[in-house]
Amino acid sequence: MKVTLDNINNSDTSIFGDWINNSDILSNEFINNKPYEHIIIKNFLNNKIANKISNEFPSDLSNYFKYNNPLEIKYAFDSIKDMTPDLKNVFYALCSNKVTDALKNITKKNNLDYDPTCHGGGLHIHENKGKLCMHLDYEKHPVLENKQRYLNIILYLTKDWKDEWGGATELWDENMKKCIKKSNVEFNSALIFKTSEKSWHGLPEPIQCPENIQRKSLAFYYLIPLENQSNVNKLGN
């Protein structure tokens, strides 16, 4: 999936919630949260667009790539040209200067920029028994030279998810001894966290949702110039 400048210039950043205009006050929470830098933003999008893209979220799994391996069981869809106009606009808006500047304010990383390849991003579905083992994302970008992933956004888009079904994104300590924080699957809330050599995360227990329910999420990433060489021991994409 390639994001072009024309797409970004035509994007509508009014789709976001109030946080977009109050990003400065979120920085301390992001920087000081444990086990590593992260923040959970509720009402990430305005309610109207959140409901629209949830309803438009493609559920036909024949169009998805299926991951079924020891690390993860999930479906991924990243063909932006085949998404609805509202879904496309969300991805384009995430690349806009307004959103990137807000994330710079939160992270205090002034050289932050969006990933134009959206590598590993897109729309994700976990069904019953879906999982994602604890892992570290890559740092060195596998496509873009001299770039590394710095920030990960996961936006939950399933309505009326029940906590007892599992599916929360777990954040573990750097020694992988225990879970420190859980980001529950709450509709229109976004987990934003720094990607590093200690940002262990995942949903390690198989999801126990009903067969007709899907855990739907949108993923997007931001990059910085390469600072660290890729760690060959890392797992993830």
Task: Set out the residue ranges of the language-model regions.
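Non-heme Fe(II)/2-oxoglutarate
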Residues: 18-19, 25-107
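A structural signal for the main folded, soluble domain(s) of proteins
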Residues: 73-77, 106, 112-115, 119, ...
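Eukaryotic charged/polar low-complexity linker/IDR segments
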Residues: 152-154
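Proline-centered turn/helix-capping motifs that create local helix->coil transitions or kinks
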Residues: 61-63, 111-113, 159-163
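Catalytic core of Fe(II)/2-oxoglutarate
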Residues: 2-6, 129-130, 137-149, 158-237
